[in-house]
Amino acid sequence: MSMKSQFERAKIEYGQWGIDVEEALERLKQVPISIHCWQGDDVGGFELSKGELSGGIDVTGDYPGKATTPEELRMDLEKALSLIPGKHRVNLHAIYAETDGKVVERDQLEPRHFEKWVRWAKRHGLGLDFNPTLFSHEKAKDGLTLAHPDQAIRQFWIDHCIASRKIGEYFGKELETPCLTNIWIPDGYKDTPSDRLTPRKRLKESLDQIFAAEINEAYNLDAVESKLFGIGSESYVVGSHEFYLSYALKNDKLCLLDTGHYHPTETVSNKISAMLLFHDKLALHVSRPVRWDSDHVVTFDDELREIALEIVRNDALDRVLIGLDFFDASINRIAAWTIGTRNVIKALLFAMLIPHKQLKEWQETGDYTRRLAVLEEFKTYPLGAIWNEYCERMNVPIKEEWLKEIAIYEKEVLLQRH
């Protein structure tokens, strides 16, 4: 049976449940995923005075072909984007500034240091998102930044975050799509603290100072990101979920939920509906934690599908900003981007092809047998036929065909790098 015939047959199967496949494919086209640049160079960045990777973050593996220049990183991103259906965004950290061979401290960064990224994004029709980098730096070596007891160090990081928001505003204005500027800090303690309140008070005061700088929200959206623990902050993290949830609600900021930043038995999918009742928007960093915040490449697993279901069934595609955050240096880095991003898009398609109205009715009337049975049956409905058609229409390879492109690129480009 031809691929087109498989698609038409699958359309009929889904259509029996009142699911409009064509409408789902049109909706899917409109959903941008924010693809993190740091998978391409193992969270290295391009600072001239480069610090060791810190902040409780670790990248394992030594696969050949890592990008070592901005040009190489952009070229690799272009390759990945050519294999991923849809129009998307690229997420940058401050350490990816281009300073023309001059040492520019992070609190002195300006929009001009990202002009090449903006020109590139314009050329490819991409949005850009941004993050201040509060790790891998001499002034973060003791694991404290915005909550540091030393006012001078604290001010350095406050100024860096203010500079980052201005860069985000520049991105949004130039590219005519709001930039999400997200603040994550590594601050915490390895062992049990004797005072949990004071560092949080300092963090609150730092954030208040950062957000007091006026920025046009039409161009820049502010987000704050929590974490349960990191290497070196096992016992206490200043920016906990409760801290940022409260701060975001009170100050009208976005909460960003990273799927690897919670207890292993705690799921982000279970938080989305609760937060949508109280927040206009929220943001995600989709990752795959294996026993801890290991940032494995995202797979098409139960939690990814459940996150997609929560977004789609609650009609929140325009309220939940979806980004990625994983890094694996043990496999081809362009393949890592491709696998993870395609899986997120595939999960959204899966969620769009579910009879949500009927399932909700069964839940409301107490028919839990039908609810469970049908949800399980839909796991083996012909999603693959619809996905292949979508990829074909979006001019990207179907199924695993994209691996051929990766193999050619690896041989001709990646393995030539030294």
UniProtKB/Swiss-Prot annotation:
The keyword Magnesium does not apply. Its cofactor is Mn(2+). Keywords: Cytoplasm, Isomerase, Manganese, Metal-binding, Rhamnose metabolism. One of its GO terms (cellular component) is cytoplasm. One of its GO terms (molecular function) is manganese ion binding. Its main location: cytoplasm. One of its GO terms (biological process) is L-lyxose metabolic process. Pathway: Carbohydrate degradation; L-rhamnose degradation; glycerone phosphate from L-rhamnose: step 1/3. Mn(2+) binds at residues 261, 293, 295. It holds the Pfam family RhaA. InterPro entries: L-rhamnose_isomerase (IPR050337), Rhamnose_isomerase (IPR009308), Xyl_isomerase-like_sf (IPR036237). Binds 1 Mn(2+) ion per subunit. It is found in: Cytoplasm. It catalyses: L-rhamnopyranose = L-rhamnulose. Its EC number is 5.3.1.14. The keyword Transmembrane helix does not apply. Belongs to the rhamnose isomerase family. Catalyzes the interconversion of L-rhamnose and L-rhamnulose. This is L-rhamnose isomerase. It comes from Halalkalibacterium halodurans (strain ATCC BAA-125 / DSM 18197 / FERM 7344 / JCM 9153 / C-125). The gene is rhaA.
